[in-house]
Amino acid sequence: PQVYNWIHDSIHEVIHVDYKDLADGVSFQQAADEFLDWCGEEWIFCTWGNQDVMELQRNMKYYGMLSKIKGPVTYYDAQKIYGICYNEDPCRRSLEYAIDKMHLPKAQEFHRALTDAKYTGEIFKRLDMPAVLANPSIDVYQNPKTRKEEIYLSYPNYDEYVSREFA
């Protein structure tokens, strides 16, 4: 931990991690480098929700590492796609709700990064792949810089345009 020297009680209740757990871990820089090495050259993130990609980039910017991820970042939001596939869109369901609805075993606690990633993967691999491929998400923490980099996506029910930054 380098920014905050404590974890608020309400956060601790959700994520079940305390300050000592973080102090005993590797640095963010090392973890991010190892993660990106593991991802390889051609990657696309899959998340449960729309905040993880932005938070990763915010932390990478803080540590001077943002250039390692070219934005805008395209990713698959399994929470959004779950809602589409199960006719619950635009409702955003919890990871545990989706696990229960899909009758998947709950062997570990929720709100732990590795466990939640495994649960998200189990849900993701059961989603309708044409629906997945038709519904990528774009994180615009890093906006396009030029007209050539602008993004236009056409979804089944709407279109999305991500324009470049203007001075």
Segments predicted by a language model, with ranges:
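Cysteine endopeptidase catalytic domains of the caspase/legumain-like
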Residues: 41-43, 105-111, 160-163
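Active-site-proximal helix-loop-helix substrate-binding element of RNase H-like nuclease domains
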Residues: 6-15, 19-22, 81-117
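Active-site catalytic microenvironments for nucleophilic, acid-base chemistry
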Residues: 59-63, 84, 101, 126-130
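Acidic active-site catalytic centers that drive phospho-/nucleotidyl reactions
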Residues: 52, 77, 116
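A structural signal for well-ordered alpha-helical segments within the folded catalytic domains
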Residues: 54, 118-121
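Conserved non-catalytic scaffold segment of RNase H-like nuclease domains
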Residues: 1-61, 100
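Acidic two-metal-ion nuclease catalytic site recognized across multiple nuclease folds
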Residues: 122-167
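Histidine/lysine/aspartate-rich catalytic loop segments that bind and position anionic ligands
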Residues: 65-85
